[in-house]
């Protein structure tokens, strides 16, 4: 599995601000969008381009244009919505596919409770966004859904990832690409990433 820890100074700086314990909802939400945007910039660096001729102010001009690769952004509810706008800044014409997951209290396994996916996933690059890759369960289940619908090209964008989640994701879906602002130390006994960001969903939405 391709794993990219984006170490750009802007990413490191903004992520550091997100780790502050008493950060406001407004600041956390804005930074999630900004870091999501920077991760998207990295994740789309391999998109193919083609030469086309346009009418410029001085006549015909040859330019580069993205070569017909359609994109869908897939936020995992609810926290993933906080990164969605950062992706759309770069690919504003992308379709939005939404997946909702909850954890079964008995099995502790993620269970999908909502999905609204692009109808032509087999033709699209799916960019899945979720602030945290902790155990990897929700991400794996989401990718299972996408592949079941024919999606063949998937990139994952997370703000922080735990080594345990990366290992779990790679074991099941070695063909996906992972882009993260930080690979953190570990998961604690409650399944939280350390040092992590706390509960990203609560911080983005301001509700528990």
From Swiss-Prot:
What does the record give as cofactor?
Mg(2+)
Record's superkingdom?
A: Bacteria
Q: Does the keyword Repeat apply?
A: no
TM annotation in the entry: none
Residues that, per the record, bind uracil: 193, 198-200
The record's cofactor note says: Binds 1 Mg(2+) ion per subunit. The magnesium is bound as Mg-PRPP.
> Which EC numbers characterise this protein's activity in its record?
2.4.2.9
**Which biological process terms from the Gene Ontology are attached to this UniProt entry?**
UMP salvage; uracil salvage
UniProt pathway = Pyrimidine metabolism; UMP biosynthesis via salvage pathway; UMP from uracil: step 1/1
The activity regulation comment is: Allosterically activated by GTP.
Which Pfam families is this protein grouped with?
A: UPRTase
GO molecular function terms here? GTP binding; magnesium ion binding; uracil phosphoribosyltransferase activity
* Xref: InterPro entries: PRibTrfase_dom, PRTase-like, Upp_B, UPRTase/APRTase, Ura_phspho_trans
Q: Which SUPFAM superfamilies match?
A: PRTase-like
Q: Which UniProt keywords apply?
A: Allosteric enzyme, Glycosyltransferase, GTP-binding, Magnesium, Nucleotide-binding, Transferase
Role noted for this protein: Catalyzes the conversion of uracil and 5-phospho-alpha-D-ribose 1-diphosphate (PRPP) to UMP and diphosphate.
* PANTHER family on file: ADENINE PHOSPHORIBOSYLTRANSFERASE, URACIL PHOSPHORIBOSYLTRANSFERASE, CHLOROPLASTIC
Family membership, please give it: Belongs to the UPRTase family.
Name of the molecule in the record:
Uracil phosphoribosyltransferase
Tell me what organism the protein belongs to.
Histophilus somni (strain 2336) (Haemophilus somnus)
């Amino acid at each position: 599995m391709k794993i990219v820890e984006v170490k750009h100074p802007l990413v490191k700086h903004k992520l550091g601000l997100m780790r502050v314990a008493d950060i406001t909802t407004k600041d956390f939400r804005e930074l999630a969008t900004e870091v999501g945007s920077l991760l998207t910039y990295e994740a789309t660096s391999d998109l193919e381009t083609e030469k086309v001729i346009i009418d410029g102010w001085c006549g015909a001009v040859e330019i580069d244009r993205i070569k017909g690769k359609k994109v869908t952004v897939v936020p995992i509810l609810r926290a993933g919505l906080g990164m969605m706008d950062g992706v759309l800044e770069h690919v504003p014409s992308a379709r939005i596919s939404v997946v909702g997951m909850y954890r079964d209290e008995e099995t502790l396994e993620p269970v999908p409770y909502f999905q609204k996916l692009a109808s032509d996933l087999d033709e699209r690059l799916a960019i899945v966004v979720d602030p945290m890759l902790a155990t990897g369960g929700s991400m794996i289940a989401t990718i299972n859904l996408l592949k079941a619908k024919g999606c063949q090209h998937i990139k994952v964008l997370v703000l922080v990832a735990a080594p345990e989640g990366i290992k779990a994701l790679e074991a099941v879906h070695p063909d996906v690409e992972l882009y993260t602002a930080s690979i953190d130390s570990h998961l604690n006994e409650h399944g939280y990433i350390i040092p992590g960001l706390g509960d990203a969903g609560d911080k983005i939405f301001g509700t528990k």
